[in-house]
Regions:
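Predominantly the structural core of cysteine protease catalytic domains
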Residues: 29-38, 98, 104, 108-112, ...
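Bacterial N-terminal signal peptides that target proteins for export
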Residues: 1-9
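Bacterial N-terminal signal peptides
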Residues: 11-20
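Sec/Tat signal peptide C-region and signal peptidase I cleavage site
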Residues: 23-25
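N-terminal zymogen propeptides
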Residues: 27-86, 363-367
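Substrate-binding/charge-relay-adjacent region of secreted/lumenal peptidase catalytic domains
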Residues: 62-163
Length: 436
């Protein structure tokens, strides 16, 4: 497929330890404000909100068309006391993650799938309308099943490459032979090009006003539309999951939603774990300090003021990636006050995305092999003159250059053959040439 009406010379420069290389071109009730209130705003907490390689000026919402955080009015009077977007047909079934794929379970398999189905007017009832955690996870797990990832790894993969459907790509699941394997076949990469993230954003949630903005996003994205049913978004969370028994409570008999489990805080130890916030319930509560009351207006932590940290009523609805039977139905409540935990910075922020459809103007099909993909370097260039010795425009595809966006190549793509561990056969991929 030509880039324009005039002929172009397309050249591919490959540098690395190549075993062989071949290429073929182709075609509640309203909440009151804290005494000192911080409003919802964009934030870039390190190291989990954006790639360090992009620098301090990188705006992760750039490319999105919807209003950024802080650009909409948060009118809490319109909010219902409960929202659960996991009951919408656009939300995929819960399943149990394998390996360290939780970040991609949240960012891609859950949030990206939900948002893309809303955009397309489809439902997540088949593999043709669901998106796998494993395509993006295998891009950054160094071919190591124990290696985790940030949500932004999936969202940046979706921005630069795209995400194929489960029907086309499949799932890695418990198959260790597929850990670190890259998709082999131009059609898989070509399909992925169409499904993209336009922008993503992290915001702090440490005050009542910030919680209210998050509630509004979950209800109708803080964009009420007259005559239309509200359609809310989802939010990414990074929780600390060690010693969960110490922070898990069961709502007692006689209280609202008795028998349901609720986290009153993040776990006191352990590493981060990606989970998905699908809604909220302002009536869910638990008597955290044991005074016989479930209150929102008492200074229970003794710091001399009443803030979000003192609230015992109001909770997010969280979907975990530990299977449909975990905590009865794969979901649990998380008190709003847990978001203030000063010992777990990651747990003080929520992530969101905007998705888009993209039709590439021109593509390139490559078939190549490399015995160590962390050393591979590929540059694609074009020139208007067929006899040109220098490209007029160049493109260095992230996957074929060790994903420099994510840092050190060996920590991302792994020191394995291009196709995957133990497989030195040629890999066929597709590259979107639209940026050229």
């Amino acid at each position: 497929m030509p880039l324009t009406a005039r002929p172009w010379l397309i050249a591919v420069l490959l540098v690395g330890l190549l075993a062989s290389s071949r290429f073929i071109s182709a075609a509640s009730s309203p909440t009151s404000a804290d005494k000192v209130e911080e409003r919802a705003q964009a934030a870039y907490p390190k190291p989990f909100s954006r790639p360090n390689s992009m620098g301090e000026d990188y705006n992760t919402w750039r490319g999105a068309t919807g209003p950024d955080v802080g650009q909409t009015v948060v009118d809490i009077r319109r909010l219902p006391s409960r929202v659960d977007n996991s009951t919408r047909p656009q939300f995929p079934p819960i399943y149990k993650q394998k390996g360290g794929a939780c970040g991609q379970f949240t960012s891609i398999a859950s949030i990206f799938t939900y948002e893309m189905n809303l955009l397309n007017g489809t439902v997540a009832s088949t593999d043709a309308t669901r998106f796998p955690a494993d395509f993006s996870w295998n891009m950054c797990n160094a071919a190591n099943s124990a290696q985790g990832s940030e949500a932004y790894h999936g969202w940046e993969t979706a921005k630069h490459v795209g995400i194929p459907t489960v029907k086309t790509y499949g799932r890695v699941e418990a198959d260790k032979d597929l850990i670190g394997k890259w998709a082999n076949g131009y059609p898989i990469w070509r399909e992925a090009m169409e499904y993209r993230v336009a922008g993503y954003r992290y915001t702090p949630t440490a005050t009542v006003a910030q919680i209210d903005e998050a509630r509004g996003w979950l209800f109708d994205r803080n964009q009420p539309k007259a005559g239309q049913a509200p359609v809310g978004g989802l939010l990414a969370l990074d929780g600390r999951m060690g010693e969960l028994k110490k922070v898990t409570r069961t709502i007692p008999e006689g209280d609202y939603l008795a028998g349901e489990d609720v986290w009153i805080d993040w776990g006191p130890s352990g590493f981060g774990h990606g989970i998905t916030c699908v809604g909220y319930d302002d009536q869910v509560g638990f008597d955290v300090n044991g005074d016989g009351k479930v209150s929102n207006d008492i200074d229970i932590n003794g710091d001399g003021k009443v803030t979000l940290a003192d609230r015992e009523r109001g909770a997010f609805i969280v979907v975990n990636s530990w299977g449909q039977t975990w905590s009865k139905d794969g979901k649990i409540y998380l008190l709003y006050s847990a978001m203030v935990d000063p010992t777990w910075k990651r747990g003080n922020y929520l992530g969101r995305i905007e998705v888009s459809r993209h039709i590439p103007r021109s593509t390139l099909k490559l078939k190549l092999a490399c015995n160590k993909r962390s050393d591979l370097r590929v540059t694609i260039g074009i020139a208007g003159d067929k006899d040109a010795t220098k490209a007029e425009h160049e493109l260095a595809p992230q996957p074929l250059n060790g994903w420099p966006l994510f840092g050190k190549p060996k920590n991302n793509v792994g020191e394995v053959p291009l196709a995957g561990p133990g497989d030195e056969s040629p890999l066929e991929i597709g590259i979107d040439l639209t940026p050229l």
